[in-house]
């Protein structure tokens, strides 16, 4: 699947699982991050570059993601 021109949401489901959703339809791809240091870097980058919204629905946290995050996760998984 081509990610470059898509706008994604990254949904933090557990401390180690990020699920990408497209236009509120999920799951497009799921990334399990085993490295806590990497996860912290990714989350901090998203906080800097993107917006974070809390939701009261099924998913507790939705992070509007940048392309950098996709590349970063793919590089290390």
UniProtKB/Swiss-Prot annotation:
Cellular component GO terms held in the UniProt record: cyanelle
Entry keyword annotation includes Plastid: yes
Alphabetical UniProt keywords: Cyanelle, Plastid
Main location: plastid
Domain of life assignment: Eukaryota
Cell compartment(s), UniProt: Plastid, Cyanelle
Protein name, entry field: Uncharacterized 9.4 kDa protein in trpG-ccsA intergenic region
